[in-house]
Regions:
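Gly/Pro-rich cap/lid or specificity-loop segments adjacent to the active site
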Residues: 2-111
Length: 111
């Protein structure tokens, strides 16, 4: 649905495989065409397909690390699609823990 100048609708994955939410998040899909939005579903580290390989890797299972993962992906998308960070919005979506992540991301990374 994306067209230049449209926002990124960014789903912050939570405590399950992100594919469970792709078809259950109608709000994003219903509004994306009207806004020309790029729709992205990002999976949370160590959930879904990305599993913990060993106990030492668990140190990276934190809210702070999850937020940094999402910010890194958003930065990559903004560069890849030549977004104007001053004008083009990133709108976070999520439910349950993912909803809290969306709120925390907005507070910690308002840009």
């Amino acid at each position: 649905y994306y067209y230049p100048g449209g926002p990124i609708f960014f789903y912050l994955g939570n405590e399950a495989d992100v594919t469970l939410y792709v078809n259950a998040t109608g709000l994003m899909w219903e509004n994306a065409p009207a806004f020309g939005a790029l729709v992205v579903f990002a999976e949370h580290r160590y959930y879904g397909k990305s599993r913990v390989l060993n106990n030492t890797a668990l140190q990276y299972l934190s809210v702070e690390q999850a937020l940094m993962d999402y910010v890194t992906l958003i930065d990559f998308l903004q560069k890849s699609y030549e977004f104007d960070k001053q004008k083009d919005a990133v709108i976070g979506f999520g439910g349950s823990y993912g909803g809290m992540l969306a709120s925390w991301a907005r507070m910690q990374y308002p840009h």
